[in-house]
């Protein structure tokens, strides 16, 4: 296997690799939108990544069998500049996924560090277990898991005495201690997510007012006991 720089001329092949992985994921989760893996969607994003950020590819038997790129974010998950590789920014043929991702990160991770990125994060489709394992072997941990389900009623009731309602701006004073408590909790072992400063009422208010954002609170009597946003 040969590891080389990912170039613009490789990106249509890269889209095909991601589409193949996404099709396998859709077999397990059919409600996923098939258009998420279309070349029309993925190709412009990959082109944008390569305009200012590095990428690598792996070639075997005369064809590209894997690729990986990403983009940089200042103060990413803390005070340091970081690199983020989303689920469409990497893919590999399943037969060699562990080894190809290990080789790609060995090459690309060094480029990221050379560019001043000290925090590295990678998104995976759940199907790509061998790729995930390669990063676990390199010392990565899990910080977030997203789940997808059909939009339909859930047959469940709140416990007796518990009321669940959308959070209003008038609830921010009760909400703020829960947010801060959660942030302090994940800053401790074993997560160690950096805790820089408490979120402010103004920040939470801005979040609630942003179109498309939703947040819910569970109340036990007059006490706020849980939230989801």
Question: Where would I find each of the regions flagged by the language model?
Answer:
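A short beta-loop-alpha structural element at the N-terminal edge
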Residues: 1-16, 22-27, 163-178, 183-187
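Conserved donor-binding loop and adjoining core beta-sheet/short helix segment
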Residues: 15, 21-103, 219-229
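A generic secondary-structure signal
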Residues: 45, 107-111, 206
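Short loop/turn motifs at secondary-structure junctions and domain boundaries
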Residues: 46-50, 206-211
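Acyl-donor-binding surface of acyltransferase catalytic domains
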Residues: 72-75, 85-161
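Acidic, serine/threonine- and glycine-rich low-complexity intrinsically disordered segments
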Residues: 167, 176, 184-202, 206-209
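ER/Golgi luminal nucleotide-sugar-dependent glycosyltransferases, focusing on the catalytic module
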Residues: 201-205, 214, 219-220
